[in-house]
Amino acid sequence: MLTWLQRDSLTFPPLAKAMREPNGLLAAGGDLSAERLIQAYRHGCFPWFSQGQPILWWSPDPRTVIFPDELHISRSLGKLLRQQRYTVTFDQDFAAVIQACAAPRAYADGTWITQSIQNAYLALHQRGYAHSVEVWDNGELVGGLYGLAMGQLFFGESMFSRADNASKFGFATLTRQLQAWGFVLIDCQMPNDHLHSLGARAISRSDFAGFLRDHLDQPNTGPWVS
């Protein structure tokens, strides 16, 4: 039976209670307050729902992740990186990045990044938890991504690209920086071909929970929340 969250409690059910079908559905309801979102990521779940649906919380098994030292750089991406084809910045325009991620895609009917999601993650950005990566081409924003940093873990949320390999360029740059800062894992949530091309692989929910337990409260050497 699906658990419905109460607005006056930040408690989530155990991850083992998540449904097998649909894979990982853990709970519904609650709200998108910064406090609840922070607790959700610490617990091992994330919000994902469409316009008109209740807030749905997920913890899929297996979980798609990238270990920074396993980042795969294709020949074409490596060439762009060597040429420094684009300029990459962090936290320079979070609002523009999340708005671009929310824009309609040719391969999808709608977006899960509703206005309420945008507002919630902007609040997390203002608190220092959510971060953006911007990819620029001669001053024009052509790609980027956003996610949350906690301890030695980065939780990726969404990315966009308006130019050849721009989002991969930004992701590769971020991954190298995260590794230098002592991050050990990037949570990618759900699998897709784009992520697999960058080296993503699946780990069990229990293994993912172990990374949360061991690394959420460990310091990183970067400027982000630790």
Curated annotation (Swiss-Prot):
Gene3D superfamilies to which the protein is assigned, alphabetical: Leucyl/phenylalanyl-tRNA-protein transferase, C-terminal domain (3.40.630.70), Leucyl/phenylalanyl-tRNA-protein transferase, N-terminal domain (3.30.70.3550)
A GO CC term attached to the entry: cytoplasm
GO MF annotation, one: leucyl-tRNA--protein transferase activity
Name used for this protein in its record: Leucyl/phenylalanyl-tRNA--protein transferase
Keywords for this protein: Acyltransferase, Cytoplasm, Transferase
Pfam families with a match to the protein in the record: Leu_Phe_trans
Entry's family note: Belongs to the L/F-transferase family.
Domain of life: Bacteria
Catalytic activity: N-terminal L-lysyl-[protein] + L-leucyl-tRNA(Leu) = N-terminal L-leucyl-L-lysyl-[protein] + tRNA(Leu) + H(+); N-terminal L-arginyl-[protein] + L-leucyl-tRNA(Leu) = N-terminal L-leucyl-L-arginyl-[protein] + tRNA(Leu) + H(+); L-phenylalanyl-tRNA(Phe) + an N-terminal L-alpha-aminoacyl-[protein] = an N-terminal L-phenylalanyl-L-alpha-aminoacyl-[protein] + tRNA(Phe)
GO terms, biological process: protein catabolic process
NCBIfam families tied to this protein: aat (TIGR00667)
InterPro entries: Acyl_CoA_acyltransferase, Leu/Phe-tRNA_Trfase, Leu/Phe-tRNA_Trfase_C, Leu/Phe-tRNA_Trfase_N
Organism: Pseudomonas fluorescens (strain SBW25)
Subcellular location: Cytoplasm
EC number of this enzyme: 2.3.2.6
Biological function: Functions in the N-end rule pathway of protein degradation where it conjugates Leu, Phe and, less efficiently, Met from aminoacyl-tRNAs to the N-termini of proteins containing an N-terminal arginine or lysine.
